[in-house]
Amino acid sequence: MLLRVTHCPVNTAGVPWHNVQALRRKGVDARLVVFERYKLHPEADWSLDRRGGFVRQQLTQARAFAKLLPQTDVFHFYFGLTLVPKSLQFPLLRATGKRSVMHFLGSDIRGKPPAQLAWADRAGAKIVGSYDALRWVPDADVVPPGIDLADYRPRAPSDAERPIVVHAPSARRRKGTKEVIAACAQLPVELEIVEGLQHDEARRRYERADIVVDQLNAGWYGLFAIEAMALGKPVVTFLHDEAVARTEEAFGTKVPIVNATAETLVERLRPLVEDAELRRSVGAASRAYVELVHDADEVADRLLAIYARL
């Protein structure tokens, strides 16, 4: 019998849409339903386009849930959000024999105490995107975000004496943009900050990069870094050492990202700025890493294994 999976209710960083597309390639009847379309990642099969105040929005969501319920075997929720209030959502799913997953994406759990996330135990399974995120949800399954690698043809970094450094902050303070600007001012580089663009246009900017700086505060990398690595770019970001070790053990490969803090960014960038061959070798290793860890088709297999045990 064909498995029917509804992913909802947001398309944060494009992760849900990548998952839906990969599951479809596996023969799953998968769909993405969102509250509203995001500017950066507008992809979805159905947008509720909620209007009005809280009560009207809740009615819109409840009607959508009622429509989706008979069409769905597994509800795959994201970002700590559900279609109807959590106090109703999970009891209703259990009463109707439906399976559920809560998939956390990073900023929805970062820094929150366990008691604040205990509600997620009502879901059939919990997923996080990295071993770093297990600090907040230690009993979750780790499924790194996947992308369709066929959409990302590697573009090797150039030999430019003033290489292009690309930084694409979703939130400047959280990503350490001020420190990135200060560091690049001390080096012979061209800094391009990519903000507020549609995803296709943003990716064209990423393709021009010789070096990519992701973030300096979070302790792990996000989808921007994954896309940059898929394009064969060397990525500089701040990583927690324990999460690096656990990732390398789990996947049997080195994490090729250049680890930096705000204090060490200049010294970590300098070798990449001065050595084009180093840029290319790190970029090639980055593409190989993404093929192993972030291939959307492999991610779909991990999701199917989780669904099967619910």
Say what each PLM segment does:
Residues 4-9, 65-85, 101, 212-215:
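Short N-terminal targeting/anchoring amphipathic segment
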Residues 277-307:
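A charged, aromatic-enriched C-terminal amphipathic alpha-helix characteristic of glycosyltransferases
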Residues 109, 121-154, 160:
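Donor nucleotide-sugar binding/catalytic pocket of nucleotide-sugar-dependent glycosyltransferases
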